[in-house]
Structures are given as C-alpha cells and as structure tokens.
C-alpha cells in the first residue's frame, strides 16, 4: 500500500507541478500533500474529479498551530476515495492575516469545517458563504485552540438564578497556573529530557 501511495503522490505532483510543494508518505502509511494556499481550490477540484484520484468525500478540515513559524497555521484537509479505497491529507500553510480560499464550491461540507477552523484558530477563509463562530459563544474573545490562548480563558459564563439569565464574569482562580513555555521541546522519540546535557 505504501508504494501505491508514493505512486499516487508522484502522479498528483506531476499533474500539478506549480501547485504541489511536496508529497510524503509517513511511517503510518498516510499520503500527505503540501500545496500552495492560493492553489487549494484547483488542487481539491483535481483530487475530486481526476479518474486516478476520485477523492469524492471531504472527511474533515482541521487546523494546527505552530507559533514558532512565520506561517503559523496549517489548514489540513482529509479526503477519502471510496472508488480506490485511499485517503489523502492536503496541507496548506498560512498566517494570521492571509486568507485561505474556501473550498465550499468544491465540497459543500467544507462550510462547517472551515467555520470551526476559523472559530478555534482564527484562520480566515476568503469567499466563504457564512464565516462566523460555530462552537463558541457569539461574544467570545479569541480563538481557544491557539497555543497562546490562556488555559482558563478570559471570562467565565454561568446561569444566574436571581437574574434568570446567563452572566459573564472575570475568571477567579484559587491558585495561579505555572508559566509554561509552549515552544520548548517535548519528550518524544527524538528527544528525551536531559539529552541536552549529554553533549
């Protein structure tokens, strides 16, 4: 299956050489394409309509926050081809001010997914028919899945029995959180705590 995905990645990259920046089959056997943000509609249309691809189902659109990068956000599209029994992941990099073209014209289901990415990360989508919050309250400040968003949020919302309505109050904590450097390396297969002292 891995070779078939590598061949598919090469097939797509050869068909769209100006739009596809890179292809990769990861160790889990998943094909990822990195494409130019301006080309996302063209690439998604090709993946949906080309006889060698036929990725007719948009499974999900999600965001990833990389605060250390200049283009801080990745928008990640997950597609499924029932005809060829294959999946592909399409990644686009963007920053806080640059809008990614909406793919709602190609996959209508992208409407809610893109709204969720905007609500959680603040990634803008141009030509979206209804870009507004979908998971948080209308008066919510900020985007809660960004790594620099405070764990406690900014306000606390609760129902007040006396006034018979929802009220917003500043967050009150009995103990402050410790400072956390979210750019520090984490324990993982390539780095263990204390490795930096070994050299």
UniProtKB/Swiss-Prot annotation:
<keyword id="KW-1278">Translocase</keyword>
<keyword id="KW-0997">Cell inner membrane</keyword>
<protein>
    <recommendedName>
        <fullName>NADH-quinone oxidoreductase subunit C</fullName>
        <ecNumber>7.1.1.-</ecNumber>
    </recommendedName>
</protein>
<comment type="similarity">
    <text>Belongs to the complex I 30 kDa subunit family.</text>
</comment>
<comment type="subunit">
    <text>NDH-1 is composed of 14 different subunits. Subunits NuoB, C, D, E, F, and G constitute the peripheral sector of the complex.</text>
</comment>
<dbReference type="GO" id="GO:0048038">
    <property type="term" value="F:quinone binding"/>
</dbReference>
<keyword id="KW-0874">Quinone</keyword>
<dbReference type="InterPro" id="IPR001268">
    <property type="entry name" value="NADH_UbQ_OxRdtase_30kDa_su"/>
</dbReference>
<keyword id="KW-0520">NAD</keyword>
<dbReference type="InterPro" id="IPR010218">
    <property type="entry name" value="NADH_DH_suC"/>
</dbReference>
<keyword id="KW-0813">Transport</keyword>
<keyword id="KW-0830">Ubiquinone</keyword>
<dbReference type="GO" id="GO:0008137">
    <property type="term" value="F:NADH dehydrogenase (ubiquinone) activity"/>
</dbReference>
<comment type="function">
    <text>NDH-1 shuttles electrons from NADH, via FMN and iron-sulfur (Fe-S) centers, to quinones in the respiratory chain. The immediate electron acceptor for the enzyme in this species is believed to be ubiquinone. Couples the redox reaction to proton translocation (for every two electrons transferred, four hydrogen ions are translocated across the cytoplasmic membrane), and thus conserves the redox energy in a proton gradient.</text>
</comment>
<keyword id="KW-0472">Membrane</keyword>
<dbReference type="GO" id="GO:0050136">
    <property type="term" value="F:NADH:ubiquinone reductase (non-electrogenic) activity"/>
</dbReference>
<keyword id="KW-1003">Cell membrane</keyword>
<dbReference type="InterPro" id="IPR037232">
    <property type="entry name" value="NADH_quin_OxRdtase_su_C/D-like"/>
</dbReference>
<dbReference type="GO" id="GO:0005886">
    <property type="term" value="C:plasma membrane"/>
</dbReference>
<dbReference type="Pfam" id="PF00329">
    <property type="entry name" value="Complex1_30kDa"/>
</dbReference>
<dbReference type="InterPro" id="IPR020396">
    <property type="entry name" value="NADH_UbQ_OxRdtase_CS"/>
</dbReference>
């Amino acid at each position: 299956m891995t070779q078939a995905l590598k061949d598919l990645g090469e097939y797509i990259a050869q068909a769209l050489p100006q739009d596809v920046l890179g292809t990769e089959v990861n160790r889990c056997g998943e094909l990822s394409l990195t494409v130019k943000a301006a080309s996302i509609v063209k690439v998604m249309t090709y993946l949906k309509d080309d006889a060698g691809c036929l990725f007719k189902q948009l499974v999900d659109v999600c965001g990833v926050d990389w605060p250390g990068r200049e283009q801080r956000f990745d928008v990640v599209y997950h597609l499924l081809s029932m005809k060829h029994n294959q999946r592909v992941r399409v990644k686009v990099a963007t920053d806080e001010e640059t809008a990614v073209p909406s793919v709602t014209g190609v996959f209508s289901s992208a409407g809610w997914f893109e709204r969720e990415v905007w609500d959680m990360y603040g990634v803008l989508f141009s030509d979206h028919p209804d870009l507004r919050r979908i998971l948080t309250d209308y008066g919510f400040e900020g985007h809660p899945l960004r790594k620099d968003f405070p764990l406690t949020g900014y306000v606390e919302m609760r129902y007040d029995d006396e006034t018979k309505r929802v009220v917003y109050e500043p967050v009150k904590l009995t103990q402050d959180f410790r400072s956390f450097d979210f750019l520090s390396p984490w324990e993982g297969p390539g780095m263990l705590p204390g490795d930096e002292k070994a050299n």
